[in-house]
């Protein structure tokens, strides 16, 4: 499957829908997004979609790795960190402090 096909797949559309719902100042893990999009074992696929995302309407900087690690951001981890800092999140090294307080989870699948 090509990158373009993956971006335009029904799963990708569900992922974009989930990520758009993450409010400023909150984050979700790749696994959280995968589960909300109906494929709980597809965290890596979500990570790949986030890495490739160039759409300004999708706040992909709000999707982080397990345990609150920043994860990649298309090679721009410093930018991801600065965007999250601007939204009020705090860090210890490359981990979000008090992930449980800022973690957003969609209760139902899309």
PLM ranges: what are they?
Residues 1-110:
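Nucleic acid-binding interface residues in structured DNA/RNA-binding domains
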């Amino acid at each position: 499957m090509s990158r373009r096909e993956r971006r335009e797949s029904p799963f990708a559309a569900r992922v974009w829908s989930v990520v758009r719902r993450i409010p400023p100042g909150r984050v979700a893990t790749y696994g959280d997004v995968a589960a909300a999009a109906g494929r709980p074992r597809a965290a890596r696929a979500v990570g790949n979609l986030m890495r490739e995302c160039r759409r300004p309407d999708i706040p992909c900087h709000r999707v982080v790795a397990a345990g609150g690690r920043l994860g990649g951001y298309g090679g721009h981890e410093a930018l991801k960190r600065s965007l999250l800092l601007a939204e009020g999140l705090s860090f210890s090294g490359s981990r979000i402090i008090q992930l449980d307080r800022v973690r957003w989870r969609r209760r139902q699948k899309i």
